[in-house]
Amino acid sequence: MLVHGRRLGLLLGRSHVAAPKHTSHLPRRTVHLNHFVSKGEAASEAEPPQSTFTVAVKDNIATQAHPTTCASNILRDYTSPYEATVVRQLRRRGARVVGTTNLDEFGMGTHSTHSAHGPVASPAGRSAGGSSGGSAVAVAAGEVEVALGTDTGGSVRLPAAYNGVVGFKPSYGMLSRYGVVPYANSLDTVGLLARSVERIRDLVVGEGLWAQHDDKDPTSLSAAARLRCASGRTGYKGEAAKVGWEGLTFGIPLEYNIFELDPLIREAWEEVAALLQSLGANVVPVSLPTTRQALSAYYVLAPAEASSNLAKYDGVRYGNPGPESENEGGVLYSAARGAGFGDEVKRRILLGAYSLSSEAMDNYFVQAQKVRRLVRGDFDRVFLLDNPLVDKEPTEEGFGEEAEQADLADLHEDVPLLNKRGPARVDFILSPTAPTPAPTLDEALSQTSLDSATNDVFTVPASLAGLPAISLPVDMKEDVHGVGRFAGIQIIGQYWDDARLLDVAVALRGVLGRGLV
């Protein structure tokens, strides 16, 4: 296909992309990974007598057997009086929780380096990704079968890509957030990491997590709404369905072919697209024009919500008051927050508070909400399936079925798109998970906040729209030190199309694993 008159090279011949071999990337010398905050087995009332698989829990998800610190000094000694719903649900399905994992403080970061417990390193000695870096490393190192993380703007998918594992973010409202320490309520989503897509599918679909409404979580979709959403979808009634590639169409978003995209990542993207074509799937270009503004909107909305959520950490309800709090003229919470929060959290609180101020609300927060609606509209326009939570009628913004995508008439005649001036309708969207491979830990520590934010450019749009997305690992060429590096390939589905998305991921991962490409 072409981008601005130049061929991207996605329509290749035979490809050589393959799923990573998890033993090949481990360094010869042991690296201090620092991925667990608390480790140890403890029984729970919800735990069955015979546990069947091991789970690590991100340290911003409440457990009673381990402290819940959110990698912050302000919660250093905090232990939750109750257990998160999703942890209890996994225990009842045979999980044994072996510990809690390190993260960026309160989930705010890209490399799991903003932690009161110190930075996390991947088994390859590189950035573990963030903010669920500890969970991804626990899976990559083979210490657990499944790990829980949270995904606000890519915090499950990015670590999965950096560590060569599978990372799944379900549709917003599917898995309960009760017991999850909030960063941004309208974006936070509990996600799963594992080496096997099948394991994730078994839990979400086979074990029925998708159907579990939680009265304690106001963002949990009601039981009636779940059934209504599932009624227009396939894959929720039984075992994984056999995927018929010939009937599927994958969209390649033109706007994702950015200048900053690493050539090795682009090559992996091209090869997976070519592989899908060789299997019989249709691969076409699509336009998601508002995704260019998605990252900026996210970094207005998420900090704004965070500034409100973190207001409770005042040294009275949470945290320890500092000595200055005893002064009559002092501010009670100033010392507690100053000593308890790290630099990145303080930065985002200030940014969020400003965007909610009277002088900035209209220019920043309100505009960011408009961009968010446009991003969702872009996805709804290109997906074959309708969004069950959205009115299908056209709106003033032009989201409806009659809306047209950007003019693609200059694309090469060989590109299989029937109407290059109308909306291309696809089953799934295929993109890289991250624009670059995992940087070294030193490179990650030296990145500015702006540099780190750009790593989320491909993951944020699905988060803003509340869509399910999965990151699958593929091998890239070895670096100069002979250490294997991974590319994450992301597949995005329409809202509540999680079961079919997981079926496709299982099938694609199986082909990659067999090397039949």
Curated annotation (Swiss-Prot):
Keyword ATP-binding: yes
UniProt entry tagged with the keyword Protein biosynthesis: yes
GO annotations of cellular component type: glutamyl-tRNA(Gln) amidotransferase complex; mitochondrion
Enzyme class: ligase
Active site: residue positions: 58, 131, 155
PROSITE patterns: AMIDASES
GO BP terms: glutaminyl-tRNAGln biosynthesis via transamidation; mitochondrial translation
Renumbered residue ranges of the record's region Disordered: 106-132
Main subcellular location: mitochondrion
One Pfam family here: Amidase
Keywords: ATP-binding, Ligase, Mitochondrion, Nucleotide-binding, Protein biosynthesis
Catalytic activity: L-glutamyl-tRNA(Gln) + L-glutamine + ATP + H2O = L-glutaminyl-tRNA(Gln) + L-glutamate + ADP + phosphate + H(+)
Subunit organization: Subunit of the heterotrimeric GatCAB amidotransferase (AdT) complex, composed of A, B and C subunits.
Similarity annotation: Belongs to the amidase family. GatA subfamily.
Job of this protein: Allows the formation of correctly charged Gln-tRNA(Gln) through the transamidation of misacylated Glu-tRNA(Gln) in the mitochondria. The reaction takes place in the presence of glutamine and ATP through an activated gamma-phospho-Glu-tRNA(Gln).
Name of the protein: Glutamyl-tRNA(Gln) amidotransferase subunit A, mitochondrial
